[in-house]
Amino acid sequence: YAYVRPETDKVFSREQFAQYLQQAKIRFTWGDLDGSGDTLVIPLPEYLDTWVAGEKYNNASISVNEFKHSGSMINNLKEIYPNSEFVEFYHKGSEQYSGMDWRILRLVFDEYQGKRYLVAIVNEQWTV
C-alpha cells in the first residue's frame, strides 16, 4: 500500500476527480486486498471513506518531508516523487486493538507557478 506503482495507480485530473466524486456508479480497480488477494473494485467516494478515512487523522502526529513512521512494506515515495514535498499524518492506532489499527496518510505536493498542488495520496496501514 505504501509502495507507489505509477504504471497501475489511479491518476485523475482535477476535473475527473470532481466528476468521480459525484458519480458513485463509476467503479475503479484499486488493487488487491492484503490477506485475501481479492481485487478491490469500488467507486472513488467509497475508496476515500474506507481507505483514506480522513477522520482517523484528527489527532494524528504530523511531519513534513520526513518519514517518522512506516510499516513493513517498501516505501518508494521519494523515488517516484524525488522533487515533491509531502505531509505525513500518523494515527498510532487504538488501545482496543493494541495499535494494530495504525495508519499513515501521506499527501504529496508539487509546486507549479508558485502554488502547491496535490499530486498523490499515499495510504499505508497495518495489514496481515
Model-derived features: where do they sit?
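C-terminal-biased regions
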Residues: 1-128
